[in-house]
């Protein structure tokens, strides 16, 4: 595949996107603050963290906050999880009415026991029949309200190595009305250990071509722009979804676009990292308040400082920061050229 063709527009049903480098849903990170930063650094498409269908129908205030669109999000997807088709359908209708997202994504890939024990997340990949019922209910509900909003599904390779059900799950999702698929090619048993098997993504791409040219997006072991290029070349997937690789590193989206289109990318300075962290803190505070934002930002600051000399000292202070002033002091000491 020619390098210039690796970065390109993509369509998910009626939804047209200018690029194919996405920010995946990440629990505890994919809030509107970080999504906004990711968009500033050229993420082509962004997803909310997964939203509980049960909490949504209970009218949870926290859940309503999770689905809020960032101010600079032209397009975004809301990811929902659950195992009850009726509840999932009701959740989808509520979301379409209240948030008007560009896409609704169904989580059939989360490996966390607290999710799978309810029959949701990766447990749906293990049970293609149940997945079909969930996707069909959601798709029917969404398309009846607004046919411009595609329903998509993210799956895993399977429950364990001896039971790889990705093909059956993917086909069930498409037959039920899903207009795109995303695949994390690890099993639920692996969680995030070991290597992601990109060969499975390539196999799914081939299968999906026979199901009506359904686009397939890949995730797993994407930690650098070079990883994205390698996945696109190896699998011929329609696009890539950065998850953990984007934590504290929203710059990876622009760098990946540069690598795919120009063959090189511009390194990010420590000052740029700290300025992005400071901006994220303030965006987060607009949503949850200064105190809560500072608590959440502690671990995120550590991610921003990854790979920098002297990070241990700054991070030790950052994990105890409880105010804007505390973070400003840490940032000024780490990079005096930043005038805060």
UniProtKB/Swiss-Prot annotation:
Keywords linked to the UniProt accession: Flavoprotein, FMN, NADP, Oxidoreductase, RNA-binding, tRNA processing, tRNA-binding
Catalytic reaction equation(s): a 5,6-dihydrouridine in tRNA + NAD(+) = a uridine in tRNA + NADH + H(+); a 5,6-dihydrouridine in tRNA + NADP(+) = a uridine in tRNA + NADPH + H(+)
Annotated InterPro entries: Aldolase_TIM, DUS-like_FMN-bd, DUS_fam, DusB-like, tRNA-dHydroUridine_Synthase_C, tRNA_hU_synthase_CS
Pfam families in the cross-refs: Dus (PF01207)
Gene3D superfamilies: Aldolase class I, Putative flavin oxidoreducatase, domain 2
Record-listed FMN binding positions: 25-27, 79, 154, 219-221, 243-244
Positions of disulphide bridges: none
Top class in the EC scheme: oxidoreductase
EC number(s) recorded for this UniProt protein: 1.3.1.-
Cofactor dependency: FMN
GO molecular function: flavin adenine dinucleotide binding; tRNA binding; tRNA dihydrouridine synthase activity
Active site: 110
Keyword Transcription set for record: no
Function noted in UniProt: Catalyzes the synthesis of 5,6-dihydrouridine (D), a modified base found in the D-loop of most tRNAs, via the reduction of the C5-C6 double bond in target uridines.
Family statement: Belongs to the Dus family.
NCBIfam families registered for this protein in UniProt: nifR3_yhdG
Protein known as: Probable tRNA-dihydrouridine synthase
Organism annotation: Treponema pallidum (strain Nichols)
Gene name for this UniProt entry: dus
